[in-house]
């Protein structure tokens, strides 16, 4: 296995969350083993772009991946954590760079090792210096560069590593158990905080996602785009943002293509999952499905009808078991043309 040093940084949103999550995702790869993690640092941005400070760290990993394979997987991890490459050296949820790959020196179109900016960046070198041995090829060069950069305008200081979101949820669940009169240390509840934290990660998996990207568009004969494309009975579940109780049901989604553009059929259920797997209300889910589909396709019309059962209605308050809430949203021809709207509604009977 090859010893590799990675530099990581984040300056958007919950910075430590993105760093912890990136470490977790990297470590899940069967050909990557996380050996050491540096302290967490806060640094001022470089490059002239006005933006928030960064949280940085370094990783020492052992890998069986070749450099370009590793780079490709790193890009997958960055993409999964909402990395957008809009501004060079600009703000980002996560940035992962290969700094050193054993003693390798290489230069290809999209990868230079050692990283070409490494010896100009205090936030890269100081965390890595924690992880290297004195016999490392670049030890003396790193030590010298740190001494020189420490008197520059680059600001860097160690910060406290925060608990991961999962750890924070576990602590909160223990407090709730105490507050309702339970004993978190009794046998039946010992694993409950961890189970609840894992459950929240699963059912609120879209909570930190800023954009729906899981779709592909196709072209068809534009003369055949007057008919309705409908997928009905799409199951969904979500959690009410008012009481954090579940609600679940079915979504029915239709659109009329324009300019020969259609979306892969499996992507509409994925869109329903995306908008529902976060704290929300049914009205927002209904509108979000329609608005996002409109942004993607710019179709002639969109129709959405959602039917849901709400535990905040059935288990508390009025306690009306089996009651159904229906919400609808119409855009374009479905809003303006009664016949199209009725065709959609009658197809659901």
From Swiss-Prot:
Gene3D superfamilies: 1.10.286.10, 3.30.1130.10, 7,8-Dihydro-6-hydroxymethylpterin-pyrophosphokinase HPPK. Residues 1-226 are annotated as: 2-amino-4-hydroxy-6-hydroxymethyldihydropteridine pyrophosphokinase. Keywords: ATP-binding, Folate biosynthesis, GTP-binding, Hydrolase, Kinase, Multifunctional enzyme, Nucleotide-binding, One-carbon metabolism, Transferase. Pathway: Cofactor biosynthesis; 7,8-dihydroneopterin triphosphate biosynthesis; 7,8-dihydroneopterin triphosphate from GTP: step 1/1; Cofactor biosynthesis; tetrahydrofolate biosynthesis; 2-amino-4-hydroxy-6-hydroxymethyl-7,8-dihydropteridine diphosphate from 7,8-dihydroneopterin triphosphate: step 4/4. One of its GO terms (biological process) is folic acid biosynthetic process. GO terms for molecular function: 2-amino-4-hydroxy-6-hydroxymethyldihydropteridine diphosphokinase activity; ATP binding; GTP binding; GTP cyclohydrolase I activity; kinase activity; zinc ion binding. Its EC number is 2.7.6.3, 3.5.4.16. PROSITE patterns: GTP_CYCLOHYDROL_1_1, HPPK. It catalyses: 6-hydroxymethyl-7,8-dihydropterin + ATP = (7,8-dihydropterin-6-yl)methyl diphosphate + AMP + H(+); GTP + H2O = 7,8-dihydroneopterin 3'-triphosphate + formate + H(+). GO terms for cellular component: cytoplasm. Residues 226-349 are annotated as: GTP cyclohydrolase 1. In the N-terminal section; belongs to the HPPK family. Homomer. This is Bifunctional protein FolKE. It comes from Lactococcus lactis subsp. lactis (strain IL1403). The gene is folKE.
């Amino acid at each position: 296995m090859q010893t590799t040093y990675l530099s990581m940084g984040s300056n958007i949103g919950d910075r430590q969350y993105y760093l912890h999550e990136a470490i977790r995702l990297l470590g899940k790869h069967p050909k990557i083993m996380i050996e050491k993690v540096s302290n967490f640092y806060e640094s001022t941005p470089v490059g002239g772009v006005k933006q928030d400070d960064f949280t940085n760290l370094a990783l020492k990993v052992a890998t069986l991946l070749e450099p370009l394979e590793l780079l490709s997987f790193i890009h997958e991890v960055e993409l999964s954590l909402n990395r957008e490459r809009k501004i060079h050296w600009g703000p980002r949820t996560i940035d992962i760079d290969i700094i050193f790959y054993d003693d390798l020196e290489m230069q290809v179109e999209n990868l230079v090792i050692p990283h070409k900016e490494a010896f100009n960046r205090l936030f890269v070198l100081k965390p890595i210096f924690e992880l290297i041995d004195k016999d490392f090829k670049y030890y003396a060069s790193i030590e010298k560069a740190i001494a020189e950069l420490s008197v520059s305008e680059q600001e860097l200081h160690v910060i406290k590593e925060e608990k991961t979101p999962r750890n924070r949820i576990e602590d909160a669940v223990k407090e709730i158990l105490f507050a309702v009169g339970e004993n978190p240390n009794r046998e039946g509840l010992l694993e409950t905080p961890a189970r609840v934290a894992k459950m929240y990660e699963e059912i609120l998996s879209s909570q930190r996602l800023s954009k729906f990207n899981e779709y592909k568009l196709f072209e068809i004969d534009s003369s055949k785009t007057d008919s309705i494309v409908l997928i009905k009975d799409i199951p969904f579940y979500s959690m009410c943002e008012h009481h954090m109780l579940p609600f679940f049901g079915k979504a029915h989604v239709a659109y009329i293509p324009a300019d020969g553009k259609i979306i892969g059929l499996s992507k509409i259920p994925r869109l329903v999952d995306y908008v529902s797997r976060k704290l929300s209300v049914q009205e927002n889910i209904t509108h979000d499905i329609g608005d996002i589909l409109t942004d993607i396709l710019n179709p002639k019309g969109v129709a959405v009808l959602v039917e849901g059962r709400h535990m905040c209605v059935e288990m508390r308050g009025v306690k009306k078991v089996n009651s159904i809430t229906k919400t609808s949203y119409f855009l374009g021809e479905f809003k303006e043309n009664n016949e199209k709207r009725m065709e959609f509604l009658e197809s659901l009977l």
